[in-house]
Regions:
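N-terminal subdomain of nucleotide-sugar transferases
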Residues: 1-57, 81
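Active-site proximal beta-strand in glycosyltransferases
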Residues: 3, 88, 105-124, 153
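Alpha-helix capping/helix-boundary segments
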Residues: 43, 96, 158-159
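A short, active-site helix/loop in glycosyltransferases that binds the activated sugar's phosphate group
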Residues: 145-159
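Short His-centered aromatic/hydrophobic patch
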Residues: 92-97, 116
Length: 159
């Protein structure tokens, strides 16, 4: 299969999600699959890194400056996904690249699955001191994101 992984967090950013995605990519390739990573730009990345990593223009997220959010290049990402003839999209975020992955899957009429990595209820207090999104709102937002997916993976029972 030709698999597109869509994530807002990938190396050189340091996180459990980035490590999980790299491990997933490695193991899928060992099984004979071709894996493309669609992720955000990063100033610390060599412009000529692995050709299977597609960087989408991004800016720092206001609440977490070390995390990034894509803001343009969506049509170009669709062209690349079409050119690479993806069979399935696997999103790894509920934010910019996750939404992009869902849109591209619909445009290409291919399945989209999602890994739910983060228990957001534990993080909303960092965004405008919890005044914008309350922990009780998270489940409704997440359900909305996941309503049209073909599958959801949770790496732990807590999440």
């Amino acid at each position: 299969m030709r698999i597109g992984l869509f994530t807002d967090t990938y190396f050189p950013q340091v996180s459990g999600v980035a490590t999980s995605i790299r491990t997933l990519k490695t193991e899928l390739e060992k099984l004979g699959h071709t894996v493309f990573i669609f992720t955000t730009t990063d100033k610390d990345v060599n412009r000529y890194e692995d050709w299977q990593i597609i960087r989408i223009p991004s800016v720092p997220f206001f609440a977490f400056k070390d995390r990034r959010v894509a803001y343009r290049g969506f049509s170009h990402a669709l062209e690349i996904a079409r050119q690479y003839q993806l069979d399935i999209i696997h999103t790894q975020t509920e934010f910019s690249l996750g939404l992009l992955g869902i849109w591209i899957a619909k445009e290409l009429r291919i399945p989209v699955v999602h890994t739910y990595h983060t228990q957001y209820e534990d993080y909303v207090h960092y965004i405008a001191k919890g005044m914008v999104i309350r922990p009780s709102m998270v489940k409704y937002i997440v359900r909305g994101f996941m309503s049209d997916l073909d599958g959801v993976i949770c790496p732990s029972e807590i999440v």
